[in-house]
């Protein structure tokens, strides 16, 4: 039985999204229990209204909620009994294999880092997410917004933890291909930080394939793509916006006249397949990667379907035990990276 901790009060709509999302998830997974943190009276009322299987739900009453615009410092100092903090505590105490929250990203990252700590050798956790491609291939992208200003060493650390996670989840595919997001593929391009990161990765034991432009990510050119949080977040939001724009443009075009409406009927199976593949809700659920525990961040503005998929991501990570397998690999890769760095410095 897998146990997940669910922060029920977080997100733009709170219980209106988390409870129906959790209910649908539980109905699809009889091997899961949930620890739902939040106001017990409100939670119990919402769960009963949703027809949730109460025999597989434990309610952990909390008295505080972290606001969506609350500072990380305030959340850490003043919200020790919040639904967010208590959910993460369940992972720390071994009562749950993973925690899921749609709450304030900065507060969640700060709280998770404070409670769970980072994997030895990793300075900062990163927000990582699996993105679709034009095939069945998926690509892990990080950092998607946690660290807007990074050193070359931190970017190299992101590459290490990303590579180790993908390898742990898909060992049959061999060493993951790691790409560094840049404005061109040539090693002379980019900022000084990116150029220095390129050299670090080039001398590492990772399967580094060089720079990758963002327009190649959805074509599966790499298994892991690395960027600082500023570039990564802009990249992610651009992809999400482009998908939304394209979906709307196709819909409007098919509704523009009678002929196109008739053509839409014939194309309906293909359109449904395309919509299903590009539905951003299916890829909701980002991993706070680099922590000594599994924490999944859902979009704050998601709906019940999107929140269910965030729970699916937590379930997948917990069941595969991928994060628990990577610490040794991370230590070995970081040691090799440091040795290569020292050799490079000595040769200068």
From Swiss-Prot:
Tree of life domain: Bacteria
InterPro entries: FA_synthesis, Phospholipid_synth_PlsX-like
EC number(s) reported in the record: 2.3.1.274
CC terms in the record's Gene Ontology section: cytoplasm
Catalytic activity: a fatty acyl-[ACP] + phosphate = an acyl phosphate + holo-[ACP]
One of the record's GO molecular function terms: phosphate:acyl-[acyl carrier protein] acyltransferase activity
Pathway stated in the Swiss-Prot or TrEMBL entry: Lipid metabolism; phospholipid metabolism
Subcellular location as annotated: Cytoplasm
BP terms from Gene Ontology: fatty acid biosynthetic process; phospholipid biosynthetic process
The keyword Transferase is assigned to this record: yes
Main localization, broad class: cytoplasm
Keywords noted in UniProt: Cytoplasm, Lipid biosynthesis, Lipid metabolism, Phospholipid biosynthesis, Phospholipid metabolism, Transferase
Summary of the function given for this chain in its UniProt record: Catalyzes the reversible formation of acyl-phosphate (acyl-PO(4)) from acyl-[acyl-carrier-protein] (acyl-ACP). This enzyme utilizes acyl-ACP as fatty acyl donor, but not acyl-CoA.
Complex and partners: Homodimer. Probably interacts with PlsY.
Protein name: Phosphate acyltransferase
């Amino acid at each position: 039985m897998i146990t997940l901790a669910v922060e029920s009060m977080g997100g733009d709509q709170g219980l209106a999204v988390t409870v129906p999302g959790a209910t649908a998830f539980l109905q699809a997974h009889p091997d899961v229990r949930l620890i739902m943190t939040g106001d017990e009276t409100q939670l119990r009322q919402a769960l009963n209204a949703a027809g949730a299987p109460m025999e597989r739900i434990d309610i952990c009453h909390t008295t505080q909620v972290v606001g969506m615009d609350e500072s990380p410092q305030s959340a850490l100092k003043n919200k020790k009994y919040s639904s967010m903090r208590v959910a993460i505590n369940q992972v720390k105490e071994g009562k749950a294999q993973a925690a899921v929250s749609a709450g304030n990203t900065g507060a969640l990252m700060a709280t998770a880092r404070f409670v769970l700590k980072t994997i030895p050798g990793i300075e900062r956790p990163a927000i990582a997410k699996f993105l679709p491609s034009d095939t069945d291939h998926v690509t892990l992208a990080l950092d998607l917004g946690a660290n807007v200003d990074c050193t070359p060493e931190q970017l190299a650390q992101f590459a290490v933890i990303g590579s180790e996670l993908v390898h742990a989840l898909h060992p049959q595919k061999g060493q993951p291909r790691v790409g560094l997001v840049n404005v061109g593929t040539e090693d002379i391009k980019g900022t000084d930080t990116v150029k220095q990161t390129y050299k670090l990765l080039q001398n590492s034991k990772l399967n580094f394939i060089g720079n990758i432009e963002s327009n190649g990510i959805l074509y599966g050119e790499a298994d892991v793509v690395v960027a600082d949080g500023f570039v990564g977040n802009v990249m992610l939001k651009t992809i999400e916006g482009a998908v939304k724009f394209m979906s709307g443009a196709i819909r409007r075009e098919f509704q523009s006249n009678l002929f196109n409406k008739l053509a839409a009927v014939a194309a309906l199976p293909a359109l449904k397949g395309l919509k299903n593949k590009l539905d951003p809700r299916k890829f909701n659920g980002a991993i706070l990667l680099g922590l000594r525990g599994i924490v999944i961040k859902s979009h704050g503005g998601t709906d019940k379907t999107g929140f269910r998929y965030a729970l699916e991501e937590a379930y997948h990570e917990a069941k595969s035990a991928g994060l628990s397998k990577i610490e040794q690999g991370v230590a070995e890769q970081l040691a090799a990276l440091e040795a290569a760095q020292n050799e490079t410095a000595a040769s200068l």
